[in-house]
Amino acid sequence: MPYQIKQINREDICFSDNLLEINNCPQNLYYIGNINILNTKAISIVGKRNASTKGKYYAYLIAKKYASQGFTIVSGLAKGIDQFAHIGALSVNGKTIAVLGNGLSKIYPEENTKLAKEIIKKNGLIITEYETNEKPNTQNFPKRNRIISGLSISTIIIEADEISGSLITGRYAIDQNRELYTIPWKLNLEKNFQSGCNLLIKEGITPITKI
């Protein structure tokens, strides 16, 4: 990424108050973009990479709705649900933060480099706890998810398998005493995109019934 990568630590006045409350809060964050939105009222929207068309649409609509109300939309810049959450926020010139599981020398996935540039152009923010040249690593992404939920007052899971990174984010939200919501689905038994969402509802998580 041809941008200046800067660093912020927990003692900085711009650091997120919400993030300071969580267990294992990162000591440092590396960032590109508008650091002033890090400590704003935020909602995280997450879900499957291999998302359904309806799931992507819901992510877009929900992000657009809350961004237009002044909330910052937080997600992970992954393809699928994350991608459309960021796009929904940008569609109303809203604030959005992308939290990566790798260093900022490269955007992952590479196909979302254009979206990352659009986030920066529109005064959004891209952050990570990993040093500049740290490559994407499967172990980094679940750990990254605590930051996504930790920045936010609420997390919304759009689509998720019963074993998934999105449910890890949801568990973090619960552990952090943050609100957690999900979408009730009539299951597509062939692809089983949303079984994790319905599992959360069975466990008592509040469903979003009107979008």
Task: Annotate each predicted stretch with a short phrase.
Residues 3-211:
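Glycine-biased, small-residue-rich flexible motifs in mid-sequence functional cores and linkers
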